[in-house]
Amino acid sequence: MLQYQIDRIDHQISDDRSQTGTFLIGPLERGQATTLGNSLRRVLMGGLEGSAVTAVRISGINHEYATIPGVREDVLDILLNCKQLSINSSNPETEIGRLVVNGPMEVKANDIQFSSQVEIVDGEKPIATIQEGHNLELEIHVERGVGYRPVDRRNQETTAIDLLQIDAVFMPVKRVNFTIDETAVAEGATGRERLTMEVVTDGSTSPDDAIAEAANQLIELFQPLATVTMVEEIPEEPEPSPEAQIPLEELNLSVRAYNCLKRAQVNSVSDLMGFSYEDLLEIKNFGSKSADEVIEALERIGISIPQSRTSV
């Protein structure tokens, strides 16, 4: 199998703290670059866990179409600014950040007070602008998750009326692009490919860590396929016929035949169906007359048993 390597050939951090990493992967067999590129891109864009603001409480406000006295931005603008926060929480439970400020002030992300388990990536992100003589009180809920989670209108009915929910984007990777180039090989050798991937994150994780996490998820996905085992289907036992469930008493046998069968632990027609004529004769004190009596009783309900053990 062809061995390849991955090299990060470029890494940039933007003013908003988003990170861009460019990776060179190769050499690869023809077709493998497309397989790797598509698989990694799918996981990077939708399979990685991230953090996002999921709800905001604003003092004195109970719906998103309101305005706040002394605040330049309306509630929708503030919710959008909170939604766009690049944030990283290491707590699997909901974290709540709080903000209580007086104007005049331009409120930025760094002004929100979180526990030590929450990191605000872009602390200079503007949240709101407050005029002199006014104040603003915010409560911001942060959760971890995967992918995109729209606002659950049904859940809104059971939450506090002043807790404004936000559709949450948990995806830490903002963009993934890849290109495939053919590499030069010796004459007569099979063609080789080289994969170049550009990964852009929101800064809550690095492109290197994002690639590593995506690769680990793919390994976990494909690993079980390396140990495929055949599972034998267990045939379902057929349901016993109604006749087979008839108790021995209902065959109206003679007392002698009935008692002999009972002593042989025969309690129903189902038990008798495991016997042949020869087997019946081997029951203690069970003669041919009793055996013939049993055969006739079974035939009356449409059941026959073989003459000998080897009969088919």
From Swiss-Prot:
The keyword Transcription applies. One of its GO terms (cellular component) is DNA-directed RNA polymerase complex. Keywords: DNA-directed RNA polymerase, Nucleotidyltransferase, Transcription, Transferase. One of its GO terms (biological process) is DNA-templated transcription. Its EC number is 2.7.7.6. HAMAP family: RNApol_bact_RpoA. Belongs to the RNA polymerase alpha chain family. DNA-dependent RNA polymerase catalyzes the transcription of DNA into RNA using the four ribonucleoside triphosphates as substrates. This is DNA-directed RNA polymerase subunit alpha. The gene is rpoA.
